[in-house]
Curated annotation (Swiss-Prot):
Protein name in the entry: Pancreatic progenitor cell differentiation and proliferation factor-like protein
A GO BP annotation: cell differentiation
Taxonomy of the source species: Eukaryota, Metazoa, Chordata, Craniata, Vertebrata
Similarity comment: Belongs to the PPDPF family.
InterPro entries documented for this protein: PPDPF
A Pfam family recorded for this sequence: PPDFL
Residue spans crossing the bilayer: none
Highest taxon listed in the record's lineage: Eukaryota
Length: 84
């Protein structure tokens, strides 16, 4: 069985590499004429870091409405009402 890293591990690794890339950018001299994008700003359309479990909640979210529809369908066909 394959091992899947936890969201905390992935988040820590992401922050580690972001910090190391920012420190390498800050170590450049002012004579270097390279433009860098500020990675500390959240990207538009992506969830915030505080909401790091959004995918987990949406993936495992169960809809109670669907189960109610199934029960209504079964009762309409007579399968749930007993032996007729």
């Amino acid at each position: 069985m394959a091992s899947v890293p936890s969201i905390g591990c992935l988040l820590a690794r992401n922050q580690y590499y972001r910090k190391s890339s920012v420190s390498s950018v800050s170590s450049l001299t002012s004579s270097d004429s390279v433009n860098f994008i500020d990675d500390d700003k959240p990207q538009q359309g992506l969830p915030e870091v505080a909401e790091s479990t959004w995918w987990f909640k949406s993936f495992f979210h169960s809809e109670p409405v669907l189960s109610n529809v199934r029960i209504k369908d079964l009762s309409a066909t007579g399968s749930l009402s007993g032996r007729s």
